[in-house]
């Protein structure tokens, strides 16, 4: 298998959405589709922002994985940025082939290039396999995570 990790292109969007659906369908079954125009608009915003890196893993011409790195500037930490990972997913049929590790190696390279003092991600509590994967690659559990939907009634 010939594997390349590269920046996502607009032509990749349909396959990216399929991959993200593998994660969203199992973790967020009540999420609604935002619509094609919204998806394309958001993709273009991400692609135009030099602090964001939407990556894909291309195996023999097929997109089989993705991850989104956002570089966030900070006033603390000697004004060094941090990197936040979102939407890390490898096609279920392609797992355990080094694809996720290849995506994360590229994320680490980009973070070093950007001068990030750390990388962070969150993973749903129920994703035990993902937790083991990150641990095997040297990621450490360092914080408790909390989330809140801003529009939710209190």
Name every feature range the model reports, one short phrase each.
Residues 1-14, 153-154:
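Conserved N-terminal entry element of GNAT/NAT acetyltransferase domains
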Residues 86-90, 96-109, 136:
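Conserved acetyl-CoA-binding loop-helix of GNAT-fold acetyltransferases
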Residues 56, 62-71, 89:
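Conserved beta-strand in the GNAT
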Residues 74-85, 95, 142:
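A conserved beta-turn-beta hairpin within the catalytic core of GNAT-like acetyltransferases
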Residues 44-56, 84, 140:
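A short helix-loop-beta-strand connector motif used in the catalytic cores of GNAT acetyltransferases and
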Residues 85, 119-123:
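Conserved hydrophobic beta-strand within the GNAT/NAT acetyltransferase core sheet
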Residues 101, 113, 117, 125-144, ...:
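Conserved active-site alpha-helix within GNAT-family acetyltransferase domains
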Residues 24-42:
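Conserved GNAT-fold acetyl-CoA-binding loop/helix
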């Amino acid at each position: 298998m010939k594997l390349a990790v590269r920046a996502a292109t607009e032509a990749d969007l349909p396959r990216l959405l399929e991959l993200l659906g593998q994660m969203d369908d199992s973790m967020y079954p009540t999420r609604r589709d935002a619509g094609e125009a919204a998806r394309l608009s958001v993709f273009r915003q991400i692609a135009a922002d030099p602090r964001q890196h939407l990556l894909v893993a291309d195996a023999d011409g097929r997109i089989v994985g993705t991850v989104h790195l956002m570089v966030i500037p900070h006033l603390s930490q000697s004004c060094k940025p941090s990197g936040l990972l979102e939407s890390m997913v490898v096609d279920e049929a392609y797992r355990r082939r080094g694809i996720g590790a290849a995506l994360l190696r590229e994320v680490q390279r980009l973070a070093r290039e950007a001068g990030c003092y750390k990388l962070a991600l969150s993973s749903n509590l129920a994703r035990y396999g993902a937790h083991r994967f990150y641990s095997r690659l040297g990621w450490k559990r360092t914080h408790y995570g909390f989330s809140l939907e801003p529009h939710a009634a209190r």
